[in-house]
Regions:
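Conserved alpha/beta-hydrolase "acid-adjacent" motif
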Residues: 231-239
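N-terminal cap/lid segment of alpha/beta-hydrolase-fold proteins
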Residues: 27-54
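Short beta-strand/loop motif that positions the catalytic acidic residue
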Residues: 218, 224-226, 230
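Mobile cap/lid helix-loop segments that gate and shape the active-site cleft of serine hydrolases
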Residues: 38, 177-214, 220
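Short beta-strand element of the alpha/beta-hydrolase
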Residues: 56-64
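Primarily recognizes the serine-hydrolase "nucleophile elbow" in alpha/beta-hydrolase
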Residues: 125-189, 206
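C-terminal catalytic histidine-bearing segment of alpha/beta-hydrolase fold enzymes
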Residues: 101, 108, 239-312, 316-317
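Catalytic nucleophile-loop/oxyanion-hole region of alpha/beta-hydrolase
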Residues: 71-73, 78, 94-141, 270-275
């Protein structure tokens, strides 16, 4: 048996081994920003910052999850760290969703729960917060955009279609987005998640929240991407939005990859090598958008099969590109 002295020595040695690891972990764990201080939702909604400093561009990231839950990995933390590596400050928004119990129990026939416009109010508040704290976080207020994945892409577009123009982000990045609530290609789970069981078939509400129907004049530039083989959100959603942006002469770039599926986010392993090229394409688009004097750190990634341009007008900001891989 160990003597008391030996036992104490081993405990001290163990603590000396573990504490530096815990301290390092605590230092690398991003803080959470309370954007609804003093309200009943302050513990359910927050921003997680990944700061780049140097008066950087900022992107508020809306993870997807059918308005029922969040993918805080590939569409959250990994997206934040990727943007930060490329000198873009990211703020990952955990917005209100219906959550799993509402998905399973359908209790929103009787109770309100979380539903529209809760998530939009959270995004609106996050835009206000980042702008008002721009000096503290060292971001440029003229270069604050919104990125959204899947249902988060619907939320990102809602910021320019449903908020006052004075509160619009400067650019929007919908990635494999949910777009329509009226077309046969709609993603029904996202519609139910956003509207609730008692309102998901309300025609007027569904129409007003179909992003392809309400693209505003002078809409900020949009970078739109999806995959033709998406098994979750039908690829036609993005095509509807692309057509609407084109009809409104909105400066945008649309890339549709042949393979990649859904939910790859900013992951280095999910999806396909082909679809993961969207990150490099986006960085180049953003660099051109703001005509940076300092170059973004755009790292070339593995080369996909060649893309062909289906529709292209040469000069930005009127560039409209539809890429399809062959």
């Amino acid at each position: 048996m160990l003597t008391q002295r030996a036992h104490s020595f081993l405990c001290a040695l163990l603590m000396l081994t573990i504490l530096p690891t815990l301290a390092a972990s605590a230092q690398t764990q991003p803080e959470r920003i309370d954007i609804w201080s003093g309200t009943s939702v302050r513990h359910r909604v927050w921003l997680t910052p990944y700061l780049a400093g140097a008066n950087s561009t900022a992107v508020i990231v809306c993870p997807g999850g059918s308005y029922f839950w969040h993918d805080m990995d590939a569409e959250g933390e990994q997206a934040g760290r990727w943007l930060q590596r490329h000198r873009i400050s990211a703020f990952i928004l955990r917005y209100r969703t219906a959550y799993v119990p509402a998905f399973v129990l359908h209790y929103r026939w009787l109770l309100r729960g979380n539903r529209y416009p809760d998530a939009l109010n959270d995004l609106r508040q996050s835009l206000r917060y980042v702008r008002s704290h721009a000096k503290e976080y060292d971001v440029d207020t003229t270069r604050i955009g919104v990125m959204g994945f899947s249902a988060g892409g619907h939320l990102a577009m809602s910021a320019v279609e449903l908020l006052p123009r004075t509160e619009w982000p400067k650019f929007v990045i919908p990635v494999y987005p949910v777009v329509t609530f009226v077309d046969p290609c709609m993603h029904k789970r996202s519609r139910r998640g956003l509207l609730g069981d008692s309102r998901e078939h309300n025609r007027r509400l569904c129409d007003s929240l179909s992003m392809e129907r309400h693209v505003p004049e002078n809409c900020p530039p949009v970078f739109l991407v999806n995959c033709h083989d998406d098994p979750i959100v039908h690829y036609h959603n993005a095509e509807l939005l692309d057509s609407a942006l084109t009809a409104r002469h909105v400066p945008h770039q649309y890339i549709q990859y042949r393979t990649g599926g859904h939910g790859f986010g900013a992951s280095e392993v999910k999806g396909t090598a082909e679809c993961r090229q969207w990150k490099t394409a986006f960085l180049k688009w953003l660099q051109e958008l703001f005509s940076y004097h300092e170059s973004l750190e755009v790292r070339e990634e593995e080369d996909p099969r060649p893309c062909v341009c289906a529709d292209h007008v040469s000069s930005y900001p009127e560039t409209h590109v539809l890429y399809r891989t062959v």
